[in-house]
Amino acid sequence: MEMTDPRNISIEEYDYPLPDERIARHPLAERDACKLLCYKPGQAPEDHIFSELPALLEPGTMLIYNNTRVINARLRFTKDTGAAIEIFCLEPDCPADYAQSFASTASCSWNCLIGNSKKWKEGVLTMPLEVKGVKFDLHATRTSAPGTPGQTVRFDWNAPEVSFSEIISAAGEIPIPPYLNRRSESSDSTDYQTVYSHIEGSVAAPTAGLHFTPALLGRLDEAGIERREVTLHVGAGTFRPVSADKIGDHDMHSEFIAVDRDFIADLADAIDAGRPIAAVGTTSVRTLESLYHIGVLMAEGRWTGELPQWTPYEPANGDMAASEALRAVVAYLDKTGDSTLLAHTRIIIAPSYRYRIVGSMVTNFHQPASTLLLLVSAFIGPEWRQVYDHALSAGYRFLSYGDACLFTR
């Protein structure tokens, strides 16, 4: 079945009034005490508490979440002139592999955003540090010409016993969302991480996962819910507003995903067995749906390493069964000898998109006129507005530290 091209959608159709006081500036003291709005198309919204999730999912559900961990991506340097320069690390450049970059013990370079860039046209920035009892200087050098917001910065330090991961953990700040309108606080280092995060690389949290606690994970296990992991490193583009009038003029940001071969095989088996597939957060949704289209491209010999944003809407994308597409990924990995799929995705999920993998999703309430709201609308239809109106009238808290939804199709 061919999908309708959504490029003519006007983002204004997905705007809604969000009073500032409804934006949660901090999380609740108990993560799983937040509200959970449950909705299935054609039914009325139901109000629950997040801790009730095990009883709201069908036994046998495969629940898939994003194990990425937010890094302390903001590094603040001060020039000799007193000018403050902020370097926001986005993704590794050399080495390009996240794990290798974090393990570097002398130098590495990153693609960055630079705050107060006009004050740093040349020269080396220096930050004195002490990590693990070792005193040294961290140096930052621009390796691309000034003039554009995105820049490549090389970091150097003379402390071979200290890794770059340890440096940013000690010297950096957690990059909380700009719409919170506050500086990061010490509590954000814990609050803005999921309890199951362990793969470093994100500059924003997969916020639907913030509601889980170790005790809740245990109760999910007891309820017969199978928990599995994928990795998508969330980029700063997740906060970038849609500035174009039409979705077709919006350039979707690229994000890195890593998915184990054995999980992909198990997911194909679960789909064939008719088991419910639930995703925690839009990042897991984008990863799982990307897997399908990557599999189609691999089967057709058209895979290049990155999934373009409009591929799902092309007639040539075919109508392959979900499990068949997933097994095409497994076959590709077996042929290359890789145990993990490493890829980038630019997929945009918008109304008319046909979901291939995900049957339920846990997600927060998203910003007006955002691509994440398009993803939700593609899942539950135009009733998203009814659901959001209910949440606003019922006192739900919005955005990253806010309440959650459980949508089922």
Predicted regions located by residue number:
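Surface-exposed, charge/polar-rich loops and edge strands
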Residues: 2-409
